[in-house]
Amino acid sequence: MAQYEHNSEKFGYLNLETLDGVQTALKALGFDPGKVDGKDGPNTQNAVRQFQAHATIKIDGIVGPATRSALMNELDQAQRAAGTSSA
């Protein structure tokens, strides 16, 4: 599995190295990026900023390594809270 991939019963397979994977993760975590289309539009950037504020990381609207890592951590926490395991 690549560095920014998540696979679990709750969320399924998510590749956070792709923008549509990031959008799907944001949506699953309650941060609405709008349509999951792989495009870095204003809705996606806004959702990324909201997530970055939530994760207390640099708020810049850019999906870099810190944001991807924070998304992975948040997905893992939500997975554990749901009582199912990551694959």
Please report, for each region that a protein language model flagged, where it lies by residue.
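Acidic, Ser/Thr/Pro/Gly-enriched interdomain connector segments
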Residues: M1-G38, P42, Q77-A87
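Generic hydrophobic/packing signal
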Residues: L16-L19, A47, T56
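Short alpha-helical segments in extracytoplasmic peptidoglycan/chitin-binding modules
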Residues: Q23-L26, D37, A47-Q52, D60
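Short beta->alpha linker loops
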Residues: K39, N43, V63-A66
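Extracellular LysM carbohydrate-binding repeats and other cell-envelope/extracellular binding modules
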Residues: Q50-S86
